[in-house]
Design a protein with these regions (language model features):
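Function-determining surface determinants
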Residues: 1-287
């Protein structure tokens, strides 16, 4: 397994970091990323492939972030930046997939404009193919795989610097989860839902809390089902608002990218539709 490739052999005592429940959870997560990366290479056309890989990386980053204060910052930062860069490689591909899914759902409203073989969908599929080809070059050259191995090595180094045994980790985890919950609830009260940055940031925090509550359950001895359920609800509600905003701006960028006046018109019309739907959701929220 590539996960073990960069494992250090240096003698390290007391080595609390590597033999803990937390370390085994992180190593499982690393194995999950390897599986998702292999699955993407098997079927890059399937929208779920890139999405699953990004989610696996996001989960790992949330779990590393959870112990940020308890290990060496240098390795934490290195691992975090590496993993973020890898996830970002698949970011535009994911945005295109979300947008195409939305277009297919809107086909009832605009049957001609959004026909599968029509101008809009053809343009989007060609754009996606181009992006997929760019990613394929990174894979074929070995650059992306090397980046993943570097990220794994930094993650392993970070684990070695965490000097908490399981009992200490349990205590720290309970404390941190409480703190995260309080902070999130405070932010929820203060958030301006019409502000994309604030909404997006709150959604990320809800995901972090959900992932931590889910995957750190072995440390706590049980799953905090209420928190997980609550955060899933927050995430879903904010997700639609965020997607509509991203889609709207993406469509405007596409209108600027093409010289075809018909396509420009279609993209702008669809963009307007996304922003109007977002507005309607915000008005519902206000009522």
């Amino acid at each position: 397994r590539a996960v073990d490739k960069h494992e250090g052999t240096a003698d390290c005592s007391p080595c609390v970091g590597e033999d803990t429940l937390y370390a085994s959870i992180i190593k499982d997560q690393l194995a999950g990323i390897q599986l998702a990366y292999a699955a993407y290479q098997q079927d890059p056309v399937e929208p779920e492939s890139a999405h699953a890989l990004r989610v696996a990386i996001r989960q790992l980053r949330a779990l590393l972030n959870f112990n940020k204060a308890n290990g060496e910052e240098k390795y934490y930062r290195e691992a975090g930046e590496d993993w973020r860069e890898i996830a970002t490689t698949f970011g535009y591909l994911r945005e295109l997939d979300v947008l195409m899914e939305e277009c297919r759902e809107l086909r009832g409203l605009y049957p001609e404009m959004l026909a599968e073989d029509g101008q809009v969908m053809t343009w989007l599929m060609e754009e996606r193919q181009g992006e997929q080809d760019s990613i394929q070059e990174l894979i074929t050259s070995g650059a992306l795989t090397e980046r993943i191995l570097d990220a794994e090595a930094a993650t392993d180094q970070f684990l070695k610097t965490i000097q908490l045994d399981d009992a200490q980790q349990k205590k720290a985890t309970i404390k941190k989860l409480e703190k995260m919950k309080k902070r999130l609830m405070r932010k929820w009260e203060e958030v301006d839902f019409s502000n994309h940055e604030q909404t997006h940031s709150l959604r990320i925090n809800a995901k972090k809390l959900r992932y931590a509550s889910t995957y750190l359950a072995p440390i706590l001895g049980e799953k905090d089902k209420d928190t997980i359920k609550e955060m899933k609800k927050v995430q879903t509600a904010l997700g639609t608002l965020c997607d509509l905003d991203i889609n709207g701006h993406l469509l405007l960028e596409m209108a600027d990218k093409t010289d075809d006046p018909d396509l420009q018109h279609h993209f702008r019309k669809l963009s307007e539709h996304q922003f109007q739907r977002r507005e309607a959701m915000l008005n519902d929220e206000a009522d």
